[in-house]
């Protein structure tokens, strides 16, 4: 098998490895959670900070109106209890979600194995490329080599044509010889038959 074919086979193999890697990653990768409790807490803190900043800006813009308005009354006890119950329910739901989500029990090592396979295949491809003739030559040198190869090809083609002509002539001579021999043998048989009678 020539180097170009081997190189093509290895490139096809590398493409197959990449496709397999993507499939394995889609199939076996551990789940990633976008709505984890830490992100939710950070979002709540950011919202509270934004609300506080907005309130401070409003107070700075309208200090007289803020002084005239009495502070809001505290919420009734029933409303406070409802808010506490809602918070507890949310916390319980988050805990249940965390328990239901599968936790990776062992380290997932498929990416490192696939990366090694890609690296090994790439090294083989590089070695094939380095073995290609003319890889270290300039464009002019490669052009000269191609001209020489073309000249050699024409010479070989001419030699092939002349040997073909010679073979055709030899074949004609062999056919003529066979025909001559067969006619002579017939004539001898004919000559021998009258003698026998």
Curated annotation (Swiss-Prot):
Residues 37-68, 79-104 have a biased composition (Low complexity). It holds the Pfam family Med21. One of its GO terms (molecular function) is transcription coregulator activity. Its main location: nucleus. Residues 29-110 are annotated as: Disordered. Disulfide bonds: none annotated. SUPFAM superfamilies: Mediator hinge subcomplex-like. Keywords: Activator, Coiled coil, Nucleus, Transcription, Transcription regulation. It is found in: Nucleus. The keyword Protein biosynthesis does not apply. One of its GO terms (cellular component) is mediator complex. This is Putative mediator of RNA polymerase II transcription subunit 21. The lineage of its organism: Eukaryota, Amoebozoa, Evosea, Eumycetozoa, Dictyostelia.
């Amino acid at each position: 098998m020539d180097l170009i074919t081997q190189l093509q086979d290895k490139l096809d193999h590398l493409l197959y490895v990449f496709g397999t890697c993507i499939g394995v990653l889609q199939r076996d990768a551990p789940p990633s959670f976008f709505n984890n409790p830490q992100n939710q807490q950070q979002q709540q803190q950011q919202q509270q900070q934004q609300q506080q900043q907005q309130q401070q800006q409003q107070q700075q813009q309208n200090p007289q109106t803020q002084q005239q308005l009495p502070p809001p009354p505290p919420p009734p006890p029933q409303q406070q209890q409802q808010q506490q119950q809602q918070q507890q329910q949310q916390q319980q739901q988050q805990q249940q979600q965390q328990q239901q989500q599968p936790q990776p029990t062992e380290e997932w090592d498929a990416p490192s194995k696939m990366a090694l396979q890609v690296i090994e295949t790439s090294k083989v491809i590089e070695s094939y490329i380095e073995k290609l003739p003319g890889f270290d030559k300039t464009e002019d040198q490669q052009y000269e080599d191609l001209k020489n190869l073309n000249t050699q090809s024409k010479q070989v083609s001419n030699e092939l044509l002349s040997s073909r002509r010679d073979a055709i002539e030899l074949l004609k001579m062999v056919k003529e010889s066979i025909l001559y021999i067969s006619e002579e043998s017939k004539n001898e048989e004919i000559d021998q038959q009258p003698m026998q009678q």
